[in-house]
């Protein structure tokens, strides 16, 4: 019964959520687009001509937002974008115009190599400007296990950024306040000169979800 009441409460909040309504009106697949939008407006992350990687991209609202930003560039012509977007997720994702999508597990070597190949092609053998990660583990409710899973996902994103991000580039990841959060912050501080937590208004107040932004790699790969 308690679970049913929780589901009903969540459904009520979801239906009446202004960001859900805004996403439906503006054609975004999820309200998460507005989390990225707010952070981008604050930190000026997305700029014309960039190569951007979207980790944990499904259902695609972050890729949609990035695509819209790059398509708005004065240099974008014939309906194309000024830049490149590479997205990956273990789940399927409906196509987003101008976004190269890989379905696969980021942790598998063959999938990782496919991602690297596409990134190298998009950059002409160079580095990317921005790595976005909305990846999150399936939470078990066991704090220590969930913290370890979240930290592992953060490590994967940092390792990818270390190898493929421009020295002046940025990494934005989703994480959760609680057990293990301080370890993720310390890891970011080891790798980035500028580290800043972000809690956009579109992130629900009840949620422990937060975002961590790292800029300017200390030891680029």
UniProtKB/Swiss-Prot annotation:
Group of enzyme by EC: transferase
Active site: 174
Example GO molecular function: rRNA (uridine-2'-O-)-methyltransferase activity
InterPro entries with a match to the protein in the record: RNA_methyltr_RlmE (IPR050082), RNA_MeTrfase_FtsJ_dom (IPR002877), rRNA-MeTfrase_E (IPR015507), SAM-dependent_MTases_sf (IPR029063)
EC number(s) reported in the record: 2.1.1.166
One family name in Pfam for this protein: FtsJ
Cellular localization per UniProt: Cytoplasm
Gene3D superfamilies named in the record: Vaccinia Virus protein VP39 (3.40.50.150)
Residues given in the record as S-adenosyl-L-methionine binding sites: 60, 62, 89, 105, 134
GO cellular component: cytoplasm
Protein's UniProt name: Ribosomal RNA large subunit methyltransferase E
Disulfide bonds: none
Stretches for region Disordered: 199-221
Task performed by this protein: Specifically methylates the uridine in position 2552 of 23S rRNA at the 2'-O position of the ribose in the fully assembled 50S ribosomal subunit.
């Amino acid at each position: 019964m308690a679970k049913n009441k929780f589901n009903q409460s969540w459904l009520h909040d979801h239906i009446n959520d202004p960001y859900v309504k805004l996403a439906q009106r503006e054609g975004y697949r999820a309200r998460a687009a507005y989390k990225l939008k707010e952070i981008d407006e604050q930190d000026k992350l997305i700029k014309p001509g960039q190569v951007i990687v979207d980790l944990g991209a499904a259902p695609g609202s972050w890729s949609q937002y990035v695509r819209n930003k790059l398509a708005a560039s004065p240099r974008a012509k014939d309906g194309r974008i000024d830049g490149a977007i590479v997205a990956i997720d273990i789940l399927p994702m409906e196509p987003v115009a101008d976004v190269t999508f890989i379905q696969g597990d980021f942790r598998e070597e063959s999938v990782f190599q496919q991602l690297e190949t596409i990134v190298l092609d998009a950059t002409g053998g160079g580095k990317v400007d921005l790595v976005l990660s909305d990846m999150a583990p399936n939470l078990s409710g066991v704090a220590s296990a969930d913290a370890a899973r979240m930290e592992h996902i953060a490590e994967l994103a940092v390792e990818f950024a270390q190898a493929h991000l421009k020295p002046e580039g940025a990494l934005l990841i989703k994480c959760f306040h609680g057990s293990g959060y301080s370890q993720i912050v310390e890891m970011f501080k080891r790798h980035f000169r500028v580290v800043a937590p972000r809690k956009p208004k579109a992130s629900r107040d009840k949620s422990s979800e937060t975002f961590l932004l790292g800029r300017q790699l200390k030891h680029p790969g």
